[in-house]
Amino acid sequence: MLIILVMFLLGIILGFIGAGGAGFVIALLTLLFHIPIHTALGTSLAGMAFTSLSGAYSHYREGNIQMKIGLIVGGFAAVGSFFGAKLTSFIPADLLHYLTAGMLFLSAILILIRLFILKEKAQVNQSTLSTYTRAVILGIAAGVLSGTFGIGSAPFIQIGLMIMLNLSIRHSVGTTMLVIIPLAVGGGIGYITEGFVDYVLLVKVLVGTMCGAYVGAKFTNLMPKVVLKSAIFLTPAIAGLLLLF
């Protein structure tokens, strides 16, 4: 019951900033509840397949998704994530703590770049062979990162969609939500085959975070933008710090 309560409180924060928060889930599961890091990674990533559905549907209705690009990136991300999950079993638990923390710090830096530095670029034709090739590369790279370290890689995907595929910020955010679904499914299957998904824990995490996110989303439009942007940046940074303890 305590796990559900903690995940509910975390869900409020994640709903407020509009993030999947896999890194924070991993940090809390390992630090507070002493869940083995491999199980925390697998359970967290598998859970994202469910939590991303509602967000992707909402963005689809708002016209924020480049469907063809999203399906290509997502399809190859699923493959990369599956093999990334397999790779995790060869990484010692102590080392995995530090590697995942490092990825979260890098994620925070990329978020900082996206929110405060990166400028909007005009969108170009998305139907060239070169575009599809870059989409495949982005999908595989993001998938391997997510599968190996159990995080959603949303900042990596968003930055990649903007820089490599010239998507607008709005379309990069929406398309990322679509990409994360097959990515999480592929990684989740990989972790399941390695025995790193705790189904009871998965249900507790989902119940807590999804209920909390519903509440937290109601506060998003009530806060000043500077508070929201700061929270989006600080969330993975704090999660990375927690993993170091």
Swiss-Prot record:
Subcellular location as annotated: Cell membrane
Pfam families: TauE
Protein keywords: Cell membrane, Membrane, Transmembrane, Transmembrane helix, Transport
One GO cellular component, as annotated: plasma membrane
InterPro entries cross-referenced by the UniProt entry: TM_pro_TauE-like, TSUP/Inactive_protease-like
Topology relative to the membrane: Multi-pass membrane protein
Disulfide bond entries: none
Residues passing through the membrane, by range: 1-21, 34-56, 71-91, 98-118, 137-157, 177-197, 199-219, 225-245
Family from the record: Belongs to the 4-toluene sulfonate uptake permease (TSUP) (TC 2.A.102) family.
PANTHER family: MEMBRANE TRANSPORTER PROTEIN MJ0441-RELATED (PTHR43701), MEMBRANE TRANSPORTER PROTEIN YJNA-RELATED (PTHR43701:SF2)
Name of protein: Probable membrane transporter protein YdhB
Organism the protein comes from: Bacillus subtilis (strain 168)
